[in-house]
């Protein structure tokens, strides 16, 4: 803070004061505690010569050279402030359009700063009215400033007109009102539809099947039913054996009359056969479903016969239910719901968490309408709590870890290793993330890397968004290299029948590792090409960037405070005043600062010395505790994949590690740690799991798999393997960029296995599984919600004030996905078609 004249130049003898203390000064604290108002000034110079009138009741004005705390203290007895009126100012120039913060007050060459205080209200004003007036003026000021900042130079003159600004403000409020009312009407409609249809549940029948007798039952059809769903539970396997006819199986026959029958011709009997193979391990149970089309309203007959090698009976559970709506109708509804969710996220109409919740509600309402409404217990079972536990535990670990200053230390070390070369640092970070994600879960990798990257970019005055997007893309690529790097790979390797074909851990990892290395060699130059015309450095100096970020954080803090009490209202008003004061300072710095930043830091040696003094380890003892616990957690992650005797999954390991560190760190204020947890990200994943399972019940994923199999069968035999690899890679990539790759992979494995077992097709299973792995893992880079690591990275970045939108990720992620899938497809074609590595 300094004194300036009318021409904007500093006075040579004026003292320069730098305000670094962010806490409330002592004088202001005493004034708040005493609940006093500044009295009328009796002595001193007349303030009207240097400060304007008409600001009483909302702000007071202090000379810039006077000490802030002493100014408030002296104001009690002999203040030189303007006279406080007992009512609102009647000055005609003080209206709703009057700015709360004046940029410069030139009167006799001096400058004043505004001092906001929640006690500067008159006796006739209520606290709530004053607070509402403050926030109304604050929002109006923000709206006008936002319009001014976003306007181009050509439109600046038009936007300066109050009439244009008023019309734009009314239009914005109208669009906002239409959005809220439209979404509210949609939610009410879905809620009504969901409540009209009851949860019928499934009535399971216990059957004892033997090769000596069959089981049969007659079902009466419903009037409005078009589908019949039959569920079987027991020792079943989803896919058929490699050599059909030699395994134990059961055959479900569904017989009904043809709808084309008339009174002159007897209706023909139509029989649907469903063959289900039994698991040799009778203790492993699973549930399988099959949907049949109901042709008429006549009685439907179900017959079940078993083909067993022994005469011992096999227990089996069976349930059935009628559904409304054909498969094509359900797929159309599911596609519309998925498109609506993506529209809400792409155009940022609502937050992505709320968009996923709206999509889940719409999908549940659609299931209720067709007659398959799930119970609350069933919906909760759809949520993958292992993933949520992993996220929650690692967020707790990272929150405590950040208190040690380790992330700042790592940022300085990375800056030293790169020797000031930005692209060398970015490639190094992406390569380390790719290698680490090959052995760790992608979510864990981004939870550890995102805070370090953000701090490093702040030190180097880089835009963290661009670096984080590149980092998470290479994390997803590196996760596809091993059998434990990505969930689709784990699902493929865990299949017992695929293990018999040679797709074990070592074979799968060796095959995928070669292909991913080729993908990395192509994607690193592509990343440089895509960022060729993008400015990774911030356009403003680091001081301006930090000030903007500070304003953003203060504004978010003020918005999160709910004014439920008088004290909270006072704090909220103080925070809003802080935001306005910082915006005034930002406007001055933007007006005076002009600096051109080169693409390479020439003075990196000088900067590294300053950074090492500024960014050090703040708590060495806590750092040792964090490194011990985190190292043990990562070691258990590795051990869990290779040692079957450890009965802990990733979620349990992360939760236990978080509890250990909470005890060792001796955390007393637990709420501070909970504030660091990304609850919006956890809710987004929970809603996304429900949405994907509901879409699977609407036959969307099954329909995609069946259509892919039909396209492969249509290709001539000599070109069928080429077509199968190409189709599976691209269908998996596009589907995984839109929906969760875990249920898609679990659905596609039986489809591809049945396709390979079909003697008319004659395709080997390993190339299809490798194509599925490449597409499902690399396809997650296509969109922001295509992979779990993308959502986690975006959530942490948003918590730090550097959130990126769907389109910002899409501009880089989708081209990288297309190129990486193309390289992976070419590798599979050479390996399995040319070389014959099957």
Curated annotation (Swiss-Prot):
Keyword Transmembrane attached: yes
Tissues expressing this chain: Expressed in melanocytes and retinal pigment epithelium.
Cytoplasmic side: 1-179, 348-353, 402-423, 531-620, 665-679, 738-760, 835-838
Result when mutating residue 385 to I: In OCA2; severe
Keywords recorded for this protein, A-Z: Albinism, Disease variant, Glycoprotein, Membrane, Transmembrane, Transmembrane helix, Transport
Result of altering residue 688 to F: In unclassified OCA
Glycan-bearing residues: 214, 218, 273, 442, 781
Disorder noted: Albinism, oculocutaneous, 2: An autosomal recessive disorder in which the biosynthesis of melanin pigment is reduced in skin, hair, and eyes. Although affected infants may appear at birth to have complete absence of melanin pigment, most patients acquire small amounts of pigment with age. Visual anomalies include decreased acuity and nystagmus. The phenotype is highly variable. The hair of affected individuals may turn darker with age, and pigmented nevi or freckles may be seen. African and African American individuals may have yellow hair and blue-gray or hazel irides.
Name of the protein in its database record: P protein
Species whose genome carries this gene: Homo sapiens (Human)
